[in-house]
Amino acid sequence: MAVQVVQAVQAVHLESDAFLVCLNHALSTEKEEVMGLCIGELNDDLRNDPKFTYTGTEMRTVAEKVDTVRIVHIHSVIILRRSDKRKDRVEISPEQLSAASTEAERLAELTGRPMRVVGWYHSHPHITVWPSHVDVRTQAMYQMMDQGFVGLIFSCFIEDKNTKTGRVLYTCFQSIQAQKSSESPRGPRDFWSSSQHISIEGQKEEERYERIEIPIHIVPHVTIGKVCLESAVELPKILCQEEQDAYRRIHSLTHLDSVTKIHNGSVFTKNLCSQMSAVSGPLLQWLEDRLEQNQQHVQELQQEKEELLQELSSLE
């Protein structure tokens, strides 16, 4: 029985530069949820090892050892462009999934590693970090295509009532099939409980799902990867494109009068200025500071190189 019920993923290792991009994206807007896809690889090499072919009680021990190595490594993320901006809902279009798969293939060729889309992330502004019933349902549908697919949630713009300071919470989860309601001895569960029972549209009523929390670890890096740096720079462009799409969609309506169009143009300009102040400005300052640090580090390395060369020449 222990071999049949196997947890798809035991842990997630998120690179610190990818975590930085996710955090910047989540903090870019306070009114709507944002979303992106995670690119990485699933470490399950031992599962296909021919030496794990035991049976009976011994198989259970070996299976448990194999399961412990199923770790998702997230190396970079792809920021998605929202076609429909809502406060409590965000979705992935098939076109975006296809584009993300193409990008993962490009990264696989570039790095020589089996990169693919391994998960998705989205933000929860002003609400709990735990996934809603819609999140659990969406995650279950993704896992029907890939059992190793994981979901990340970043809860931001949360204020601690005691210290009056803001904080950001994050979690990683998957969906698993829950027990039938007839087998559960307990009564109704809390809406945000980890034992929440969810029905999937189009499935039988007894096929319910609940979330399971996946341990997530941030892997520190001294430098920032090129792919993550490109994603961070791409964020202001994507936000600007979203505002342009929304403005053009409203501006194309024929029944609007001149005053309304002028008002809409003013709102569009205001939103762009807000983005420049909240996203583009701090990002530019951070890049300039990072460049200055890198230049200083290069000077230190050059000085160290000269000192080592002098020591080497003195030994000769």
Swiss-Prot record:
Main location: nucleus
List of residues that carry N-acetylalanine: A2
EC number: 3.4.19.-
GO cellular component, one term: nuclear ubiquitin ligase complex
Cofactor: Zn(2+)
Keyword Cell division annotated: yes
Protein name: Lys-63-specific deubiquitinase BRCC36
GO biological process: cell division; cellular response to ionizing radiation; chromatin remodeling; DNA repair-dependent chromatin remodeling; double-strand break repair; mitotic G2 DNA damage checkpoint signaling; positive regulation of DNA repair; positive regulation of NLRP3 inflammasome complex assembly
GO molecular function: cysteine-type deubiquitinase activity; enzyme regulator activity; K63-linked deubiquitinase activity; metal ion binding; metal-dependent deubiquitinase activity; metallopeptidase activity; polyubiquitin modification-dependent protein binding
Compartments (UniProt record): Nucleus; Cytoplasm; Cytoplasm, Cytoskeleton, Spindle pole
Residue positions of motif JAMM motif: 122-135
Family per similarity comment: Belongs to the peptidase M67A family. BRCC36 subfamily.
InterPro entries from the UniProt entry: BRCC36_C, JAMM/MPN+_dom, JAMM_MPN+_peptidase_M67A, MPN, MPN_BRCC36
Listed PROSITE patterns: MPN
MPN domain residues: 12-179
Record's cofactor remark: Binds 1 zinc ion per subunit.
Gene3D superfamilies named in the record: Cytidine Deaminase, domain 2
Gene: BRCC3
UniProt-annotated binding residues for Zn(2+): H122, H124, D135
Function: Metalloprotease that specifically cleaves 'Lys-63'-linked polyubiquitin chains. Does not have activity toward 'Lys-48'-linked polyubiquitin chains. Component of the BRCA1-A complex, a complex that specifically recognizes 'Lys-63'-linked ubiquitinated histones H2A and H2AX at DNA lesions sites, leading to target the BRCA1-BARD1 heterodimer to sites of DNA damage at double-strand breaks (DSBs). In the BRCA1-A complex, it specifically removes 'Lys-63'-linked ubiquitin on histones H2A and H2AX, antagonizing the RNF8-dependent ubiquitination at double-strand breaks (DSBs).
Class in the EC hierarchy, top level: hydrolase
Subunit and partners: Component of the ARISC complex, at least composed of UIMC1/RAP80, ABRAXAS1, BRCC3/BRCC36, BABAM2 and BABAM1/NBA1. Component of the BRCA1-A complex, at least composed of BRCA1, BARD1, UIMC1/RAP80, ABRAXAS1, BRCC3/BRCC36, BABAM2 and BABAM1/NBA1. In the BRCA1-A complex, interacts directly with ABRAXAS1 and BABAM2. Component of the BRISC complex, at least composed of ABRAXAS2, BRCC3/BRCC36, BABAM2 and BABAM1/NBA1. Identified in a complex with SHMT2 and the other subunits of the BRISC complex. In the BRISC complex, interacts directly with ABRAXAS2. Identified in a complex with ABRAXAS2 and NUMA1.
Keywords (A to Z) from UniProt: Acetylation, Cell cycle, Cell division, Chromatin regulator, Cytoplasm, Cytoskeleton, DNA damage, DNA repair, Hydrolase, Metal-binding, Metalloprotease, Mitosis, Nucleus, Phosphoprotein, Protease, Ubl conjugation pathway, Zinc
Residue numbers of Phosphoserine PTMs: S258
